[in-house]
Amino acid sequence: MATPIATTTNTPTKAGSLTIAGSGIASVGHITLETLAYIKESHKVFYLVCDPVTEAFIQENGKGPCINLSIYYDSQKSRYDSYLQMCEVMLRDVRNGLDVLGVFYGHPGVFVSPSHRAIALAREEGFNAKMLAGVSAEDCLFADLEFDPASFGCMTCEASELLIRNRPLNPYIHNVIWQVGSVGVTDMTFNNNKFPILIDRLEKDFGPNHTVIHYVGRVIPQSVSKIETFTIADLRKEEVMNHFDAISTLYVPPRDISPVDPTMAEKLGPSGTRVEPIEAFRPSLKWSAQNDKRSYAYNPYESDVVAQLDNYVTPEGHRILQGSPAMKKFLITLATSPQLLQAYRENPSAIVDTVEGLNEQEKYGLKLGSEGAVYALMSRPTGDIAREKELTNDEIANNHGAPYAFVSAVIIAAIICAL
């Protein structure tokens, strides 16, 4: 059985908590149901977002005071000083016993300094603290530019970090460079006069004629994502430099395709695997000079596989959704209510006893408080259902691996696609 990784050396002992969440990039639409639940249930919300629509949404849904952290930015002080103050104002309310939520645009752990500091300090002081996942600019970039980081690999790095630590750029993989419009900037002036230093580095590793893409994800409903294609030599032109600002990202596609190591391929390759379908899955290098502009039309192999759909029979091992309406409703509510989830974790039996409409097996499984029991009850093989096979309490209690079968299949598929 896997051992959970400890997120703190101190068991929370004090009233008050800190949750850090992300608002995503696209206004309001990227706010997750989980984050929305915390906005509605937290005593106080602090936010640092990049558009007025998201700010309005937070204020309309927060039950308590909603404070804009951008007031701590000032052109006369460093960003680091601003981040220290943002962190501290959140912690003061946590220390006063409040359940505090901090909302930062994008993913709250990506290019966000005060979020990590606040969580670390809160835990050291004995408070419960955690981070919720959010939609990052990188997620938007993958969608808008339509490339898969699992194919060929991907390196991401902040522009100043790339230069000052001489991080390697790999011409065989996808390279994503963040904050290229504020190279070497530590305050709020965002003067990009160090941008040519980055261009020198790109030209050294990729040459002046390699294509790069300037990217900025869409934010408010009226906006569209900015996707501009230049050569590295183009970046030296003043009119091109003026396109870049503090939120600009640069995507540098692979220049060459890395050769396959035949010895390693033989060791890793599954017996009998056909090369054709593997190559068909591998996406073309849309933005690269190596783009083979492959067609996704049906070749003989693909046509044969598609034709099998006409007589397809669902395999017996396929799992389908089960569970009473009461169980489905309870688990959906549990997933979208932080307060109910906390109460359930503290005493599953007490919460389950308040739920009407559950059958005895569902009550038993839910009182165990384990994910395996939920999968055992709600995801049943078609063969078991056809035979009207009843689950035993031991089967419910001892189910541990069911949720990972599908995930494993997806991971294996991704590996095959990357070959």
Swiss-Prot record:
Checking SUPFAM superfamilies in the record gives: Tetrapyrrole methylase
**CDD domains assigned:** OphMA_like
Q: Region Methyltransferase domain: start and end of each range? A: 1-255
Q: Which parts of the sequence carry N-methylserine?
A: 408
* Active-site residues annotated for this sequence: 79, 83, 105
- Pathway it belongs to? Secondary metabolite biosynthesis
Organism's domain of life? Eukaryota
Keyword vocabulary terms for this entry: Methylation, Methyltransferase, S-adenosyl-L-methionine, Transferase
Residues carrying N-methylalanine = 409, 413-414
According to the UniProt record, what class of enzyme is this? transferase
- Report the EC number(s), separated by commas if there are several: 2.1.1.-
Residues with PTM N-methylisoleucine: 411-412, 415-416
Spell out the InterPro entries in the cross-references: 4pyrrol_Mease, 4pyrrol_Methylase_sf, 4pyrrole_Mease_sub1
Extract the Pfam families matched here.
TP_methylase (PF00590)
Q: Which residues carry this modification: N-methylvaline?
A: 410
Q: What does this protein do?
A: Fusion protein of the methyltransferase gjuM and the type I borosin core peptide; part of the gene cluster that mediates the biosynthesis of a type I borosin, a highly methylated cyclic peptide with potent biological activities. Type I borosins derive from the C-terminus of the fusion protein, and it is the same protein that methylates its own C-terminus using S-adenosyl methionine (SAM). The C-terminus is subsequently cleaved off and macrocyclized by a prolyloligopeptidase to give the final product.
Summarize subunit and interaction data from the UniProt record for this chain.
Homodimer.
Protein name (record): Methyltransferase/ribosomally synthesized type I borosin cyclic peptide precursor gjuMa
- Tell me what organism the protein belongs to: Gymnopilus junonius (Spectacular rustgill mushroom)
